[in-house]
Amino acid sequence: MTLRKRLVLLIYFLFLLVPIYWLLNMSFKSNTEILGGLSLWPQSFTLDNYRVIFTDRSWYEGYLNSLYYVSLNTLISLSVALPAAYAFSRYRFLGDKHLFFWLLTNRMAPPAVFLLPFFQLYSSIGLFDTHIAVALAHCLFNVPLAVWILEGFMSSVPKEIDETAYIDGYSFPKFFVKIFIPLIRSGIGVTAFFCFMFSWVELLLARTLTSVDAKPIAAVMTRTVSASGIDWGVLAAAGVLTIIPGMLVIWFVRNHVAKGFALGRV
């Protein structure tokens, strides 16, 4: 790699890190210091902003609510997408291409299109302000994406493996769990990553379909806006803590994501 390319990468890397550093910097400042002027590091280091989040029930429950419905959504999306993707990759039937395209069109539509139908449906059947409501709503977008990614990985697995397993006496569930899934574990890791991240950062549906009991952290962060202004320090601390789950997920699936870029539909 030439010096020029390294310099460009360094500048790009710094460009990405500056907002994160500034957010972290603000989280250790008081609101007065933040509004007082620019500084590269806190003049009066304080943990009060984080103390507010960890002691205020509405704040830490927002994180727990988000983690709960995001994990639930990822689990449901993978459970539905795995057999569906296997069917699309292994079998040919009338209208399979049209069905696959129709499935993907759900992912292309913006969440606002489905907002009112979801709100009216969940309100009428008693699912409003529940974790499962948000998880199921996000499945409308994550399942098509998961099927698309997994179908690409499954298509790269030779069909002869299926036939050999059946000849050896494997039932389909046993073959699928013990043989096939380990072969596409990279695809599952990539799919879980994208499902998790979409559900974690999505705000419109999560905020509209919840009120109190299942309110996510993204919606809780908006309540820092009040008549007295914005509590920038607490908002910055909440932002830092919101980044951490995504960083942990990326760390655990980093190898699978790299393989996904090389082999799958990523």
Where on the chain are the PLM-derived regions?
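A structural signal for multi-pass alpha-helical bundles of membrane permease subunits
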Residues: 5-266
